[in-house]
Amino acid sequence: FEVSENLYADLAYLETLWNYAFKMSGDQDWLFGAYSLADVFFAPVAARIACYKLPVSQQAQQYVDKHLAHQDFRQWRAMGLTKHYDPFPYNMPCASVPWPGPRTIAAAVAQGPSENETCPYSGDAVTDFLRIDGRVFGFCNPFCRDKTLVDPAAWPEFMALYSTAKA
């Protein structure tokens, strides 16, 4: 889509804010040095910049990329994608790109039985299943399954199970 003058102005102002914060923190990875609520606040903005390939400076793009790779961001996104909306709120009539964040492991909803008897998150008995690389894993509810379906590598508890040899 064509970036409007107003959007260019908003992006320039955003970069002015970010650059000031980086300067104050000594040009660390996050706005004020360590990851903070300021970074959490700008996470959805970073996602929009990435999805619509909005024109930003190299430093701003590095900050956006840092968000996309951050475990908390990946988990937040995965949990959000477990809910489907019809109609989709705030749908914009412009082209976007496939998710530019880290590539995920291909997964699909499956039937049991599973390699594991308890959910990697809660420790509860499994009732819902997911297939990855020909292996079936169990979860205690559809939400635990679906957040893992979206981005398995965002979840250390699951990856610990996934990295073990098949039982």
Regions found by a protein language model. Give the residues of each.
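Cys/His-rich metal-chelating microdomains
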Residues: 124-125, 142-143, 147
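Short, intrinsically disordered, charge-biased short linear motifs at domain edges
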Residues: 101-111, 126-128, 165
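Cys/His/Pro-rich metal-binding microdomains
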Residues: 120, 138, 142
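Short metal-binding segments enriched for Cys and/or His
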Residues: 145-162
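Short cysteine-rich clusters marking metal-coordination/redox-active sites
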Residues: 119-123, 130-131
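Residues immediately within or flanking Cys/His clusters that coordinate Zn2+
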Residues: 116, 127, 134-137
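GST-like fold's C-terminal all-alpha helical module
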Residues: 1-74, 79, 106, 110-114
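Acidic/histidine-enriched, glycine/proline-rich intrinsically disordered or flexible terminal extensions
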Residues: 81-109
